[in-house]
Structures are given as C-alpha cells and as structure tokens.
Swiss-Prot record:
This is Large ribosomal subunit protein uL14. The keyword Ribosomal protein applies. Belongs to the universal ribosomal protein uL14 family. The lineage of its organism: Eukaryota, Discoba, Euglenozoa, Kinetoplastea, Metakinetoplastina. It comes from the Eukaryota. It comes from Trypanosoma cruzi. Coiled coil: none annotated. One of its GO terms (biological process) is translation. GO terms for molecular function: large ribosomal subunit rRNA binding; structural constituent of ribosome. One of its GO terms (cellular component) is cytosolic large ribosomal subunit. PANTHER family: 50S/60S RIBOSOMAL PROTEIN L14/L23, LARGE RIBOSOMAL SUBUNIT PROTEIN UL14. Residues 118-141 are annotated as: Disordered. It holds the Pfam family Ribosomal_L14. The gene is RPL23.
C-alpha cells in the first residue's frame, strides 16, 4: 500500500536546491537594491537541523545588504530568477546561469515591484510568481 502520485495536478518538476539560508544573491531589478541576503524560504518543510534552501521560482524572505538606504535593514519578499547550480528540465536539457539573482516582489509574493529586470529569467521562475516578472524580463530562457 504505497503512496501513489499518478495524475497529480499542480505539481512542478523539481529544481535542484541551490541557495541555502545565508546566501547573498544579486538583485536583478531596478528598485535600487544591489545584494539580497536570504533569511528564510517560504513553504520549506525539511529535515531537522538542515538549512532551508531555495531554488528557481521560490519565494524567499530577504534583506538588502547593499543598495538604497530606504531599502536596507528591512525584510522583503523576493523571487529567485537565476541560479548557478545546474538543473534538468523534463525535455532533457541541463541549464545553469552564471550568477544567482532575485527580484523584490510585493508582500503576497505575486507581482514584482519592478519596471525592469536586468539579464535573462528562467521560465520556471516566471510561472509561480505571476505575469509581471515574465513581462519585464528581456529574455526568458
């Protein structure tokens, strides 16, 4: 009597976890933040004593380490849009980026507080976080 997960709707293909709590990622939007320090990962349920880690498309709680003074020392929501750790898509392609990056989003974690994103965005990151991130991206990979 094993647990069967056939025909489960709404589950996404698993992306390799790449960014543990304490990681510093680039901020790829034009809000004025330069670096984001990951404090926690929303919706993470893991093993005892294991550091929570984020992957593409995950919503994280982050603070701004470098950037405009009005953004610093505040806890903000962000979505991871690029990661250096490679992951495999269902079609067999293996993809990775040359940096780790995220964008600041609103308190619900849906739409970004941005009007521009620098660099490409993975298509896995655009789906869960709403249409705004995908529409402001110069390239979707």
């Amino acid at each position: 009597m094993g647990k069967e997960k056939a025909n489960v709707k709404g589950c996404r293909f698993r992306v390799s976890l790449a960014l543990p709590v304490g990681a510093v990622v680039n901020c790829a939007d034009n809000t004025g933040a330069k670096n984001l320090y990951i404090i926690s990962v929303k919706g993470y349920h893991g093993r005892l004593n294991r550091l929570p880690a984020a992957a593409l498309g995950d919503i994280v709680m982050a603070s701004v380490k470098k950037g405009k003074p009005e953004l610093r020392r505040k806890v903000l929501n962000a979505v991871i849009i690029r990661q250096r750790k490679s992951w495999r898509r269902k079609d067999g392609t293996v993809i990775y980026f040359e940096d780790n990056a995220g964008v600041i989003v609103n308190s619900q974690g849906r739409d970004g507080r941005v009007s521009g994103i620098a660099g490409p965005v993975a298509k896995e990151a655009g789906r869960p976080s709403g249409p705004k991130i995908s529409s402001h991206a110069p390239a979707i990979v």
